[in-house]
Swiss-Prot record:
SUPFAM superfamilies, alphabetized: DnaJ/Hsp40 cysteine-rich domain (SSF57938)
GO biological process, alphabetically ordered: photosystem I assembly
Disulfide pairings: none
Protein name in UniProt: Protein PHOTOSYSTEM I ASSEMBLY 2, chloroplastic
Name of the gene encoding the protein in the UniProt record: PSA2
Organism (species): Zea mays (Maize)
Amino acid sequence: MASSGSCHSLLSSASPISPALFSRHRAAAVGGGASRASKVQSQVRCLARDEDSKGCANVSKAETNEEKETTPSSRRRCLVCLGAVTLISATGPPNGLAADAMNKAGVQKAVCRNCNGSGAVICDMCGGTGKWKALNRKRAKDVYEFTECPNCYGRGKLVCPVCLGTGLPNNKGLLRRPEAKQLLDKMYNGKILPRS
């Protein structure tokens, strides 16, 4: 057989786990009973063979002991490297001071939390439909009819009261200006439209 690698189950007298441990009589004789049987594990090793090799029979004890010492450390290193690569690829490259100084394209802008930077919010009175259910009392019966929303004037959206339509999270300087009173009056009377 010419194969580059194969997996073999090693259950011989030379291996640390012998078939004698699998017998019920042996476990009962030791006194462990079921607890001893639960500690039994099978051992499977992968051995790479060249075309010249004659199989598992020629593997000496010294070579297997060498493999036992080197294989777990190399597997641990591989697992650590694999975990580190996965973590780095999931989180992305770190944003340091140099990245901030070079370009700010990767950094998101701070936006208003109320409107998410759009400058407009959905009217809370009509739910964004622009229609409002009004009660019409004519004669003996009451009738509900849909009219224009008195809060948003039928538009369904209002100017954000937190950022005043700018979309920015901090506009305290805007409110200190003398023309801010006129701006607020227009906004509350519905004369300022969202996105205008």
